[in-house]
Amino acid sequence: MVEVLKAEGLIDGIGIQMHVDPQLLPSVESIVENFRSWDIPVYITELDVPTSNAMLKAHIFSNIIGAAIESGVVRQINFWGLGSASWQEDATLFDSNNQPNLSYFEVLKIVIERNCLAACK
């Protein structure tokens, strides 16, 4: 569908809602491959990972952010909600007191490691 819309000049970017089901997570390689194959800017919207397993959630967030950076075509990432009192419990980067959780620090780490605080566009 993306190719048809792009060929017709109807789109020049794509937004992807990413409410990630930890049980159905595609590989990082397939995420990067998809983003690059569209050959247009990608905007990740509504990113969250609903799971009470803090380590798994942090790992998934980190992998998605790393894949987005690696793709070179992701222009923006929006997270769904602030604290875990969001639409699904334990799905965000902050706990129910709006304090950073492990996922927050893993995302921050990957951004710093990839030197993207100022360099990512």
Residue positions per predicted region:
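Periplasmic binding protein-like
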Residues: 13, 23-26
